[in-house]
Amino acid sequence: MGKKHKKHKAEWRSSYEDYTDTPLEKPLKLVLKVGGSEVTELSGSGHDSSYYDDRSDHERERHREKKKKKKKKSEKEKHLDEEERRKRKEEKKRKREKEHCDSEGEADAFDPGKKVEVEPPPDRPVRACRTQPAENESTPIQRLLEHFLRQLQRKDPHGFFAFPVTDAIAPGYSMIIKHPMDFGTMKDKIVANEYKSVTEFKADFKLMCDNAMTYNRPDTVYYKLAKKILHAGFKMMSKAALLGSEDPAAEEPVPEVVPVQVETTKKSKKPSREVISCMFEPEGNACSLTDSTAEEHVLALVEHAADEARDRINRFLPGGKMGYLKKLGDGSLLYSVVNAPEPDADEEETHPVDLSSLSSKLLPGFTTLGFKDERRNKVTFLSSASTALSMQNNSVFGDLKSDEMELLYSAYGDETGVQCALSLQEFVKDAGSYSKKMVDDLLDQITGGDHSRMIFQLKQRRSIPMRPADEMKVGDPLGESGGPVLDFMSMKQYPDVSLDVSMLSSLGKVKKELDHEDSHLNLDETARLLQDLHEAQAERGGSRPSSNLSSLSTASEREHPPPGSPSRLSVGEQPDVAHDPYEFLQSPEPAAPAKN
C-alpha cells in the first residue's frame, strides 16, 4: 500500500474548464415592468449574479470533496501495518546516517537509488573500508599457515593450547618456561605477517609442544597430547606432504578420534565427560602408537633441523657452497655440497677433489711444489701475550719467564692443565706438608711423573748463583751468554725418563774450561769449514737446476767429509756409527784421536 495518486486534480481541471465555458454561450435576460412600460436589461458575463452564485456553490462542493478526501486519506493511514511504519522509520534513519557519514562510499551500499560519485585524488589510492575484513589482502603463505593452524587446532579439541598459560592456571609456569607459545599467539603472528617461511612456523609449533612436555610429567594428559600433536604436525608439514598431492590429514595414526571431537565441539561449547574419557581412556594404545612411530618422529625432527640450517646458511651466505669431504671405496675424494641451490634434486651436488684442484701448476725450472708458510698466521700458545700476563700473576711461581713457562706447558699440556695445577697448589699452599705431598702425588699420577721433574728443574734453575763480573775471563765463553750450567748427572736418579740416559754415566759435566791452544785450533777449523761452505754454496747457486729428479747432480767429493773428521767421531770413538742420536750432549772439547 502506498500513497494514492492525485488523479482528482486533473479531473477537477477538466470539469472547471467545461464549467467556465458553458455559461458564456447564452446569457440570461431580465424583463422589468414599471408603470406600464417595459424595460429590457441584458446581463453580461462579468455582471451576471447567477453566475457568481453558481460558482460559489461549486467551490463549496469542491472544498467539501477535498475535506472528504483528506478524511479518507487519514483513515487509510491509520490502517497501515506496523511493519510498513517500521520500515519507513528505518529508511528515514538510514537517510540521516548517510548524510552524516564520511566520504568512504557507504551511501551506495544503503541507498542504491541515490548515488553520490566521489572521485579520489589521483596520487592517493582508495583506502579499504574499516568494517570489512582484510581477508583479500592475505598472502599465500598466510593462507597456508592458517590452514595448518586450523588442522592443528582440531587435534586440540579441549583448547589446552588455545590461549597463553598463566601462573594462576599452572603454578610456577613463568619460572620454568622462559619462552611461552600457544595457538593464539601463533594466529596473531600469522595475521601480522611475521612468519616469512614454514620453517619459522614449525619452530614456534615445536616450542609450544616442548614447553608442554617440559612443564608436565610424562604420565599426564597434557604431555601425551603434546607428543601426539607434535608428531602429527611435523608429519603434516613435512617436505613430502607439502610437495606431494596426497592429503597428510588422511594418513594420521588416530583418524577416528578427530572427527568425533569436531562434531561434539560444534554441537556444544563445553565437551562432555564421556568424550574426554573416550579421548584419554586407552593410554596403552596411545603410548604404543607414539612408540611405533618414534622413527618417523625423529626423522621429522631431523628434516626440520636440516631445513632450519639450510635457511640459515642461505640467509647469511647467499650463493655459498658449504659441504663435507666423502671418501669413496676406490680412495678418491668427493666434496658434497649441503646447501645446494635445488634441494629437491634427485642427485646431490658433488665435486671431485684431487691434487690439481688444490695446487697450482709447476713453475719452470722447479721439480717440487712450492709451499709458502705465512708467518703472520703462525701463533704459538707458549709465547702469546695473554698467556704471559695470565701466568705471571700467581702465588705458587712468581715472575715466570718464557723458558719456565715452557716447562709448565711441557709438564701439564695446555693452558687449562697449567691453570688447574696452579689452582691445586695455591689451595694447599698454607695447609701443611702432608697436603702438599698429596697434591704433588696427584699431579704426578695425572702427568706421569712430569710434575716432579718440572719442579726439580725449576728449582735447579732458580738455585744456581750468578758469577760476579770481575771473575769472568775475556776468553770464557760463559761470560758472554751468562746462562746457567745444567748438570745432566742429576737425571740419573729418574729411571722412568722417556729418553735413554745410560750414556750419561760416561760423561762428567757438559762444559769444561778449555785450554788456550785448543781454542785456537777450534777457531781455525771452524774458519776453514765456513770457507768450504761458502764455496760450495756459490758453486751450486751458479748452476741451473734440472727439470727432472733423475738428472739432479749428486754431492761432489768436496762435499763428502773426509774420514776421521770431528763430524764423524762420537763420544766413545765409534767410527762405524753413521749418526749419533745424542750428539747434542757431546762436550765441545776435541777428541784425543784428533790430535794424533
Curated annotation (Swiss-Prot):
UniProt keyword terms in alphabetical order: Acetylation, Bromodomain, Chromatin regulator, Isopeptide bond, Nucleus, Phosphoprotein, Transcription, Transcription regulation, Ubl conjugation
Record SMART domains: BROMO
Membrane spanning residue stretches: none
Basic and acidic residues bias locations: 50-62, 74-85, 111-126
Biased composition (Basic residues): 1-10, 63-73, 86-97
SUPFAM superfamilies: Bromodomain
Modified residues (N6-acetyllysine): K372
GO cellular component: a single term: GBAF complex
GO terms for MF: lysine-acetylated histone binding
Residue numbers marked as site, Histone H4K5ac H4K8ac and histone H4K5bu H4K8bu binding: I169, Y222
Gene3D superfamilies registered for this protein in UniProt: Bromodomain-like (1.20.920.10)
Highest taxon of the lineage: Eukaryota
Free-text note regarding domains: The Bromo domain mediates interaction with histones that have acetylated lysine residues at specific positions. Also recognizes and binds histones that are butyrylated.
Subunit structure of this chain's protein: Binds acetylated histones H3 and H4. Binds butyrylated histone H4. Component of the multiprotein chromatin-remodeling subcomplex SWI/SNF called GBAF, which includes at least BICRA or BICRAL (mutually exclusive), BRD9, SS18, the core BAF subunits, SMARCA2/BRM, SMARCA4/BRG1/BAF190A, ACTL6A/BAF53, SMARCC1/BAF155, and SMARCD1/BAF60A. Interacts (via N-terminal bromodomain) with acetylated RAD54. Interacts (via C-terminus) with RAD51.
Protein purpose: Plays a role in chromatin remodeling and regulation of transcription. Acts as a chromatin reader that recognizes and binds acylated histones: binds histones that are acetylated and/or butyrylated. Component of SWI/SNF chromatin remodeling subcomplex GBAF that carries out key enzymatic activities, changing chromatin structure by altering DNA-histone contacts within a nucleosome in an ATP-dependent manner. Also orchestrates the RAD51-RAD54 complex formation and thereby plays a role in homologous recombination (HR).
Name of protein: Bromodomain-containing protein 9
Origin species: Mus musculus (Mouse)
